[in-house]
Amino acid sequence: MKKILFISLLSLLSCKRNNPVHPPVGGVLSQNDLDVSKNRMKNLNTVERQQIQDWITSQNIKFFPTQLNYWTTVDGFDKRERRPDESTISYSYDLYDFDQTKIYDKSISRNDARFGHFDELKAVENALRYMQNGEEVTLLVPSSLAYGTYGDENKIDNDIPLIIKLKVL
């Protein structure tokens, strides 16, 4: 009887599999996970840039690339004088998809936002630094500079490039 119990216990222990260990949310990822993520984003960015370029060629408005990887309707846009940190700005913008369908009925606006202290889309914050009071520009923004891989958890899905019509008030 002891032999049967011993053999049963031994066979049970030998069947145990090592479950993969997943890092906690916000935890540290392995180098392989980081490489996979980096390659995915690089490939997605390449595809989106080509799609945006194709869209631009079908438009009668000229768009110009910026150093941060978005396009604007102003030539030499990011060569202008840059607004400094701590300066304030009031602005509004509307979001569109590339079918030119407005995503939200109401404009998103902020009054007296301070550079370096407000949470905004990377492309919007960067563009605002180069805009003049009363100026309006249109931005073509890849998803990595918009709402990225998670979307806005409302109307904007993950990995969606956007058209942003931005105005300094």
Regions found by a protein language model. Give the residues of each.
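Sec-dependent bacterial lipoprotein signal peptides
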Residues: M1-K16
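Cross-family detector of peptidyl-prolyl cis-trans isomerase
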Residues: C15-L169
